[in-house]
Amino acid sequence: MRNMYVVASELARGHSKVKAQVCASEIHSLNKKSEYGQIIKATRAALACAVAAALGFFSPLAMADNQVSYADAQPHVLDASTPPMSYSGTDEGAALYVSGVATVGWQPTKVTGSGLVIETSGGGADDPDGGKYVSNAISLDHYAILELTDTQITTTGIYTQGISAADGSTLTLTDSTLTIDGNFGVMTLYTGSEATLNDTTVQAANGSSVQVQQGSTLNVLDGSKITLAQGQINVVAGNTATDEGSTLNLSDSSVSSAGTMSTIQGTNKAALNLTNATITHTNASGAAVQANNATTLDISGGNITSAGTGVYILASDARIDGATINADGDGIFITSKKRSTSYEDLNALTVNKAQVNSDTIALHVDTGTTINAPIVLTDSTFEAPEVIKLGSKAVIQANNTTLIGDVAQSDMSSSSLSLSQGSTLTGSVDAMFTTLSLDDTSQWNMTDPSTVGNLTNDGDITLGNASGSTGTLLTVDNTLTLQDNSQINATLDTANSAPIIKAANVTLDGTLNLSSTATFVAPETDEHFGSITLIDSQSAITTDFDSVTLDADTSAMPDYLTINAGVDANDNTNYELSTGLSWYAGANSARAAHGTFTVDAGSTFTVTSELDETTATSNWNGSKLTKQGDGTLILSNTGNDYGDTEIDGGILAAKDAAALGTGDVTIAESATLALSQGTLDNNVTGGGQIVKSGSDELIVTGDNNYSGGTTITGGTLTADHADSLGTGAVANSGVLQVGEGELENTLSGSGSLVKTGTGELTLSGDNTYSGGTTITGGTLTADHADSLGSDDIDNSGVLQVGEGDLENTLSGSGSLVKTGTGELTLSGGNDYSGGTTIIGGTLTADHADSLGTGAVANSGVLQVGEGELENTLSGSGSLVKTGTGELTLSGDNSYSGG
């Protein structure tokens, strides 16, 4: 009997010396390390069923170190009264060993327990194959079932492991603790085994890890906490694509590690299902979660924190939903490098309702990486200095997602990033080969100058310049397409010396919103208008924005100026922002087109541009010029072809009258029309005045009734008809030439009056002009001598005077005609030679010299004081000698009036 006991005991302890096993025999490989982590496989020996049956030992066997073994296909229940189970041997034994029984197929042995203590400190003996034996606190195989509650499992010593489960075994730990002080692992699950941790705490020192292999499953649930000093949870199938995948289900629990390997790693068709989990990786190397070689990663909720990479995806499929990722390194890293060629290079990523924060790159696509389907980001937020880095071709779709940080591209592949459903990108883009698109709900807040391959925008783009660059803000290497809902927002600075947008091809639509903090300084002439090139295209720009707005302090900008935006008329590859006349304001100008020029007092503005009739607006007919304000508006272009002119204040000046367009001119009271030359054939009305300046001739031909008067400061003012001079006084310091009509205006000043043409000009004003009078032809009629001013009269026509004292000296070949019944007195030393005619009344000359040299035809009364009257006297009138002097008649006279 004793010998049989020894044999059974050795079998139960898995002693390496026992080679013959009655019911089952399976020798597993010694300790090995795979490419993706440490795989522990301690040798085990089943309890010999036949020996145990012969001895009746299907109850726990009390061995040395109080080992406990079950292999009877029967249920067993342990409780707190069970003595602590332990093993300290140097071979590969276990404190608790459970195995199924080989009958018709393997029959499971089930053990349940509560309040147990299980510990091991053994292992370390040399294995004949060159390794070291590792002891386990718990060893399960052949479909064994172990369910423990409130159990303390402890390992001490280098060559110890907490749990080994193989061959379809099942382990459940609830409200338990697993304390690992060795180097050879927390647990190893392989060949289809399954372990479930419910509200269980695992504390592992050194490099001890959790290994889930060969189609096994680990469930970490309900508040379980796994703390690994340097280890990881490594979920791996095998080394070929046909090996069955292993699974980790981590729910409402936490895992942390400070090791250089990733805290959770799935490899070779593994399945990582992480639900509301907290995963912490405190080493700058490795990742919090890593999926390799066709692994499926599902993260739902929870928090992932890493001093290295947050989520590492190697040729695998990842779905992240509702999780928060905080990483010092990359938030999410996708690569194809170092993948196993046994598996397809399938990289896929979808992110939904997640928060990804990184100190470096939030989403990183490595160089040489294959992305098989669009990366879809939905209802999520990504934030990092570089929010996206593209090292390989990728299609990224952001739906209602916030991207904060720069987008960079390090390769030359054709990638794309689309923002839709209210997505926002805040940062710069350096991606010359990437197509960026925004739908009508999305926006890009560009922080610094950016480059893209193609840009299609139906949303809102703000061109930022945090670095204060003086160069181009947005460069589109190929095609810029702005759609109907597009909003482009840009702040202009005086430092902008280059176009803010450059592109090879440009299609414009939507709205351009501009702002500026610069102070507007009004120019004195339209020759000083400035412009900025907003968009520089390599091909012709044939479209335009629907509207352009300008948010700037334009309080100093007068109403006749505006800011225009449009294709440069001289270079259709440029889209310009320029100062221009409101007269020609278009749809994309800062203010609507109008014809009002308000020039403030003390200011002058000169228009050299041609003002032509243009498209009417709701408030303007497109052809009328209105001058307002007390300042001066100067029109210098004689090609102006607009309509009416209204001068409501100040001065409207034109060197040439042709600059006034073709319509009527209205001059308000106290306003002035100042002209130098040309022909003013416009009709002039109103209470204002005309000022003729300069040395040239101004001809007025209109039927004018302006009442503010006329001032001639120099040169010649010619009116074919007196009606052209309005009704106001004429202050003449030059030459006034009038052809005919009734000149009722009062004439003053140092200038002269010239009667031109063959018609009759009648003067009726009380005139004081002193520059003399010239009659070049026709008849000049003055009812009173006072109308003829005070200087000489050079008469080559007919001068008709009614009465008064004509003290002016008369000369020339013209004649003098005395009209009316009144008395006209001549007192000048006159030498006119055209003769004198007295139609009626009395012509009085103190001296005969006043009567010129021509004959006198007298039908009235001629009174002469003295002198030699050599003129021939004729007519029915009389001659009266007046005064005390001597009058001598020498002509052959025939007058008959006595």
Language-model segment annotations:
Residues R2-M63:
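Gram-negative bacterial Sec-dependent N-terminal signal peptides
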